[in-house]
Amino acid sequence: MRSRTLAVAVVITASSLVVAGCGSKGEAKSTNAAGTGTLAIGASLSLTGKLAREGVLTQEGYQLCQEKVNAKGGIDIGGTKVKLDIQYQDDTSKPDVAAQLVDQFNDKGIKLILSSYGSANTEAQAAVIERNAQLMVDSAGADNKIFSKGYKRTFAVLSPATEYASSIVKAIAELATPKPKSVVFLSADDGFSKTVTEGGMKTAKEAGFTVLDPQYFPNGTSDVSSALTKVKGQHPDVIIGSVHLVEGVAIIKQAKELGVTPTGFGESVAPPTPDFAKTLGAQAENVLGSSQWTDATKGTDKYFGTAKDYTKDIQAKYGHAPDYHNAEASAACLALVLAAQKAGSSKADAVRDALSGLDTESFFGKIKFDSTGQNLYKPMSVIQIQNGKALTVWPTESAEAKMIWPGTK
């Protein structure tokens, strides 16, 4: 590089890619008015399109991380203090666009990346990351398939997709009285949701449930009536949705309209999201959901404090209680920050090596990566909507409330 000033920029812009200063393709750099650099990290987000709500929650988590890190003077990289400067690029919820944006970051010399929202986008990005010798910390791409391809440059702070429905099944098997006998999975047809279903069905069979044939519908649809009609006559005790927010809301609404009345509902992704209970009102009561994080999570770190502290900060900054999309985004950013500090460098290879050896406590729980890039320590929690709030009911050692069963009246 022509200058010795260290620079890093977290690049995520809603309208245009902003690169601080100039530099070689190996490293982006800049100098602020006070003479300190900025650490460059690129990230596209689903700010519009079918995943926009989850994408905005991810953005909030990244923004809070930037605020917390910079409030403590930034990051010490080899003796030089640098600030995070997160700017956003909208991938419109499309995997091909998310991949193209990673290439654009690379063309600008941005080697450090925070992931988009969702498994399809993240999987598309991971292939480009590997090709370009970039580095990505994944906040929201949970599909196990991402980590079965031998990639060495993508690290995920979250639990894999197979755990989403499996956690709900385990909670019901352990806590539901009387124990239900049959379960059916209603699933969107995207890769993540299918993997959620596969994991849930396997766990349900192992737990002794009668598992009915799953029903699939288009990803992002708001009409799941056909799938519900097909299972209505089978009278399943439990319906579990492998879904995102839009499909999850549709299942609960249309089940009531069609008179589909299991003893309980569970869903991936949707119930912990604030919009779920807000949209459904009383219909959301007692629905179970799997969550990557709750404010009962154990652990602390110097930037965010505890899970309770994190909850207060999100509430104060954004006017709503946090959900796990916020938390996993902040945790991904935190992991990248800690690795850069540990490496004493902003070079992708050095930060990758530091991530490989990272073993730390955080507000998100413990973070340590295995050889595939997945978080070794990451369990999932199960929440239940009670009086309009998402309360942890499983595992019991971190429960905020007892699970209400039957979950429907």
What are these model-derived regions, one by one?
Residues A255-S330, T396-T408:
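Extracellular/periplasmic periplasmic-binding protein-like sensory domains
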Residues N32-C65, Q89-P95, Y117-A120, L186-T195, ...:
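Extracytoplasmic "Venus flytrap"
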Residues K25-A34, E54-L57, I75-S148, V157, ...:
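Beta-alpha junction/loop-to-helix N-cap segments that form part of ligand/metal-binding clefts
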Residues E60-D85, P178, G208:
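Signal peptide-proximal N-terminal region
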Residues M1-A40, I77, D107, T408-K409:
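Short, low-complexity disordered leader/linker segments with a strong preference
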Residues D96, I110-D213, T263-G289:
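Extracytoplasmic ligand/sensor domains, especially the bilobed periplasmic-binding protein
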Residues G73-V82, K298-D301, K368, N387:
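Short, solvent-exposed loop/beta-turn-alpha elements that line the ligand-binding surface or hinge
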Residues D313-N326, V337-T392:
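Segments of small-molecule ligand-sensing domains
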